[in-house]
Amino acid sequence: MSIPHTKRICQIIKLKAEAVDAYKAIHAAVWPGVLAALERAHIVDYSINHYPPLQLLIATMKYTGVDYEADMKSVAEDPETQKWWAVTDGMQESFVEGAQGSGTDIPWWTEVEEVFRFEGKSL
């Protein structure tokens, strides 16, 4: 069931083939400060999936706040998150022309359009 005022987000990026093991390892123990910054920015139900044939990372999350741009700016300004991105951005290849890394004016991850949703209900 949807949380009122929830924005669903899906993003993609390419994972460098040589970075698969390191990327999975660092995400097995995400730094607490990074998670805290996401939580302060009203990000919930966040997951990243890997599709090996295309080396595609697919991130899904829900935003439950009221000012998405301001909350994303607060994440980008968080020192622990900036250190995290300094490590993880080098493992990825953006699909966005001109992108230089996370937290800049040009998005690093590509946001993709939702074309179907079924929420159903538990029986």
Where do the language-model regions lie?
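Short amphipathic alpha-helical segments
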Residues: A19-V44
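Short beta-strand
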Residues: S47-Y51
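Eukaryotic N-terminal low-complexity, Ser/Thr- and Lys/Arg-rich leader segments
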Residues: M1-P4, G120-L123
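Solvent-exposed residues in well-ordered beta-strands and their adjoining turns
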Residues: K14-K16, K62-T64
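Terminal substrate-recognition subdomain of acyl/acetyltransferases
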Residues: E111, V115-S122
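An amphipathic, aromatic/His-enriched active-site/gating alpha helix that lines ligand/cofactor pockets
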Residues: A37, A41, Y63-W108
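Active-site-flanking beta-strand signature of metal-NTP-handling nucleotidyl enzymes
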Residues: R8-K14
